[in-house]
């Protein structure tokens, strides 16, 4: 998802609660970050790591984000109901409501390298978001690097813009475009998603140009129709499209703050 010309380092972040279990969680977090560093090194990417202690996980991530002058966040979605019954987990809503930068949330049930198809649901008016081309560039690079077919679903006003961008920047990419007249058609896409597919949903924050009330039902729709699928959810950047840096933030604990539901663990062997 990252440009090979980009030499800016990644940051691997693990935030743990400041409680009696902190020493053990710090040790676990450090071991996880060491594995992440090895994966990054195998791809010739330098990664700086930090285990951070915080009373509030979302605030801990936000403070680290500012300190490292990061440009976006990639964070895991949990798959463990014993951790949290909520789709968004306990702190993620506070995170994406508190940061206007691009946030990518992912839940992978298999190594990323084994993905054979990417399907992307794009909401109406997505082209008017400042970060439209940022997430599009990320997905184009992902599809090209995995050498898998990418299919974009969206309305007739946004698909030509995506097609023009792909033709001009990633003309060798295997790609197709399918009209999705209304967001209510989202559940119907589940029938075409296989176990080795990645389903990507481009969503929106409340108050932004592409936000719609139907997005409030996204957690229920994903839980009901895409529960076993590899999922990626993208909150577009609200500042622009400087397409270069990415930060990795790995959640380890949850806290109360939610209106959606699932997210917490990813990245161990997914890169």
Predicted segments — roles?
Residues 2, 65, 143:
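Hydrophobic pocket-lining residues that define ligand/cofactor binding sites across diverse proteins
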Residues 47-48, 52-64, 155-156, 172-192:
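A short, well-structured beta->alpha microelement
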Residues 71-72, 77-164, 169-183, 194-198, ...:
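Intrinsically disordered or low-complexity boundary/linker segments at protein termini
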């Amino acid at each position: 998802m990252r440009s090979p010309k980009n030499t800016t380092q990644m940051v691997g972040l693990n935030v743990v609660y400041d409680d009696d279990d902190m020493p053990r969680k710090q040790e676990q977090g450090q071991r996880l970050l060491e594995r992440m560093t090895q994966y990054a090194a195998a791809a010739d990417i330098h990664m700086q790591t930090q285990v951070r202690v915080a009373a509030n996980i979302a605030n801990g991530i936000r403070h680290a984000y500012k300190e490292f002058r990061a440009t976006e966040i990639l964070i895991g979605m949990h798959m463990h109901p014993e951790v949290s019954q909520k789709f968004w987990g306990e702190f993620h809503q506070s995170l994406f409501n508190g940061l206007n930068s691009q946030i990518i949330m992912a839940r992978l049930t298999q190594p990323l390298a084994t993905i054979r198809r990417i399907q992307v649901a794009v909401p109406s008016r997505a082209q008017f978001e400042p970060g439209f081309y940022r997430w599009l560039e990320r997905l184009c690079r992902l599809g090209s690097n995995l050498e898998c077919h990418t299919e974009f679903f969206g309305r007739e006003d946004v698909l030509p813009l995506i097609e023009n961008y792909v033709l001009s920047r990633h003309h060798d990419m295997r790609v197709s475009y399918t009209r999705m007249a209304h967001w209510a058609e989202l559940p119907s896409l589940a029938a075409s998603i296989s176990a080795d597919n990645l389903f990507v949903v481009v969503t929106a924050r409340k108050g932004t140009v592409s936000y719609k009330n139907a997005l409030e039902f996204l957690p229920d729709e994903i839980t009901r129709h895409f529960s076993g699928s590899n999922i990626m959810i993208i909150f577009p950047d609200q500042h622009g499209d400087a397409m270069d840096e990415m930060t990795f933030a790995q959640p380890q604990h949850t806290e109360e703050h939610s209106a959606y539901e699932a997210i917490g663990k990813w990245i161990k062997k997914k890169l």
